[in-house]
Amino acid sequence: MDIGDLPEASKTQSPKSYLYTSIARNHLGDVAALIISCLISYGRLTATDISHRTKIPVKKVKSALVSLIQMNCIFYWRESGSKQVFYSFNETGILVFLHSGDIISHVTTHYGEDSAEIVQNILVNGHIRIEDYVNNIDDEEKKLDIQTLFFRLFTDRWIVRLQPFNFNPVDDIWNQLYQETLKNTPRTSTTSEVKRVAEAKEKTKTKFINLIESGQSPKDLYLTQDGIKRLNPALVVTFNLSRFQKHLRTTALVSLAKSRVGLLSARIYESALKLVEASSPDLTHPFLQISGLINDPEEARFFVNSIENKLVDEKKTVFNVRDLGRLLPHDLDLRNSILTYNFVKHNLTPKKRSASNGDDERPTKKIKTEDSDDIAESLESNGTVQIESNGNGNSISLIQHHLKLLSSGSGAQLLIEITPGSYTVPYASLLKYLKQYNFETLVKTTLGPNSFRILRCLKSLKIGDEKTISNSVLLKEKTVRNEIYKLLKANMLEVQEVPRSADRAASKTFYLFRHKEFYSYEFLCNSLIFSMAEILSNIQAFREDHKILLEKCEREDVKGHEEELLLESELKTLKSLQTRQVSNTVRFNRIKSLYEIYQ
């Protein structure tokens, strides 16, 4: 494979190969992109094999591999007793590049410029040693501030300790531990081979978890000096992509709450999610990445739910109303945001005119919340309930009302009340509902309401023919046929041929249709990935077409004097390039926000 053929070659491999190669080419250069494309195509290879397939000299390949390993773009593995080193693709580094702009923007907003600079240095270098970074600073006071920022980022899980096994593929680590355990598990006449293998798997799981959690004890991570707890300066840290994926999940769930419940309740929901975000379950688990370990979808679902339930039992993802009240933004005013039964009753019944002049005192009564707090209620003349609150109107009772609203509803529950006043977030069920909701919205907006009705109908029926669907959705068969064709063309439905005769004559054959979420989501995800890769390729192609002009603008004597030194046609081309790049970047980010839900 030649460098010139790289874009077309990666385009025909798979959507992910196309996107990952495009990102690698933009950030790391053509040689790195070619190596990554080769590893995606052929799997694990040695440096000699990579050189043979890419036509790049071995010395240059090894030099590039060192940089790619440092950037978490490639795993390496050496079998015990062998000198050969195998390399395989690691998508973590490429995904960090994909989200790098959003990562720095988010850290800047919530942690400040200095923290963003630390994260940016980690992203650029792949990983850094804390003492190496701190020693570059001369001012002692500044050093202490930077150490504090490192401690805060580490505590909030934005950066994590990097250990040697992080450079190895999960499958190879598992296989090595499993073979050692199986070898040490003796065969007996009373124990079947199935039971022996199952026992070895359980022991290997324990060893694997212990390996992942090794080096995470407080004595390994922290030092206490003069009564101040700080990170061990000898630690090597890297960016935690899983932590940023949790932030993306929070953003998606808040958008869902906005569309389903409303803006004010969504603001409260956002604060609740941020309260438990750092302790929430990861989107992926090493056991789910090991091929052949968990194959059954039901078993995988049970495993994910068990992780979530364990966090709830440990109170890591549980919050109460008072904790949430302290975290709410000061500019959020919840007064009159809840309509009570008195308001509805007032509007449904005629007003009784009073013989008095209307200056009677309004009745007040005490209500008791689930937190056993007595709160005074004042019934206004319009029937609304005025609840005593603090300065910005965020009383415990009002927050409780909004949480009740979020934990109820006919659709998926955004919160679950486990004990009076204590709530948790059902992440597993919410992510499933989030995918369904966005998929149905996409069908409705792109293919039309009739296609949306047919899709919902098939979800309910599981399987059906044109006539059954037509009777269910109350549309003509011709309309149903046209809409089914559109859904089939978009790979959102599957078709099954049912012959009525042994010769399978077309005149005696009818067709059944079904919708399977997994394959529909997979096709949608691949389409989004391909679209993102196309946008990046278009930007790169347009820049290469005007390479001479861009190099001219980068010259020191031209910078800042473009209007004086460039021709009018060159200025127009430069403006067109900028407009096109901004437009494509906006499109890319919109597609990426949808892709993040289905990845």
Curated annotation (Swiss-Prot):
A single GO cellular-component term on record: RNA polymerase III complex
InterPro entries xref list: POLR3C_WHD (IPR055207), RNA_pol_III_RPC82-rel_HTH (IPR013197), RNA_pol_III_Rpc82_C (IPR008806), RPC3 (IPR039748), WH-like_DNA-bd_sf (IPR036388)
Key words, A-Z: DNA-directed RNA polymerase, Nucleus, Transcription, Zinc
UniProt biased composition (Basic and acidic residues): 359-370
Compartment(s) where it occurs, according to its Swiss-Prot or TrEMBL record: Nucleus
Similarity remark: Belongs to the RNA polymerase beta chain family.
Matches recorded under PANTHER family: DNA-DIRECTED RNA POLYMERASE III SUBUNIT RPC3 (PTHR12949:SF0), RNA POLYMERASE III DNA DIRECTED -RELATED (PTHR12949)
Protein name: DNA-directed RNA polymerase III subunit RPC3
Biological source species: Scheffersomyces stipitis (strain ATCC 58785 / CBS 6054 / NBRC 10063 / NRRL Y-11545) (Yeast)
Gene name linked to the record: RPC82
